Regions:
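ABC-family P-loop ATPase nucleotide-binding domain
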Residues: 1-30
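Short coil-to-beta microelement around the adenine-binding A-loop and adjacent beta1/P-loop entry
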Residues: 23, 36-37, 95
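ABC-type ATPase nucleotide-binding domains, specifically the catalytic core motifs of the NBD
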Residues: 34, 52, 90-91, 121-134
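The feature captures the beta-strand-to-loop junction immediately N-terminal to the Walker
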Residues: 55-57
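Helix-to-loop junction immediately C-terminal to a conserved catalytic motif
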Residues: 70
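Conserved ABC transporter NBD signature motif
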Residues: 78-89
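ABC ATPase NBD coupling module
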Residues: 87-102, 132-133
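Short coil-to-helix segment of the ABC ATPase nucleotide-binding domain corresponding to the Q-loop/switch region
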Residues: 113-123
């Protein structure tokens, strides 16, 4: 990441941290696949440190919701704010925000010889040169 982008991220985070806003805010999120409405008006606030479970029957939109949070799926409508930044805005550099979020997919490919913690911290340590302690603290 270049210095200009890093500074922009630090400035956005500083504004968010002083605002008291949730870490993730989802507002009226919708995702349609033609006539199928996988998500319809989903709204939720997730604060830093919250543990959240997404539970529902097969086909209820759980994976679609998580894919939208990471913007691997483009929502049909609504907004997702991460640290106060609307990541559903096409002008937002989603790659800057993906550096601070991760996801283990339903059909995951973890390294079987490593613990879950080692699998989760591998990316931040290798891609961001983060220390083991810092990666685990995330």
């Amino acid at each position: 990441m270049n210095d200009k982008k890093r500074l922009q991220m630090e400035e956005m985070k500083a504004v968010w941290e002083t605002s008291g806003a949730p870490l993730i805010q989802v507002k009226d999120l919708e995702k349609h696949f033609d006539d199928l409405h996988a998500l319809n008006g989903v709204s939720v606030d997730i604060n830093k440190g919250d543990v959240v479970f997404v539970v529902g029957p097969s086909g209820s939109g759980k994976s679609t919701f998580l894919r939208c949070l990471n913007r691997l799926e483009e929502p049909t409508a609504g907004a997702i704010l991460f640290e106060g930044v609307n990541i559903t805005d096409r002008m937002t550099d989603i790659n800057l925000h993906r550096q601070k979020m991760g996801m283990v997919f339903q059909q995951f490919n973890l390294f079987p010889h490593m613990t879950i913690m080692k699998n989760l911290t591998l990316g931040p340590m290798k891609l961001q040169n983060m220390s083991k302690e810092a990666a685990e603290a995330q």
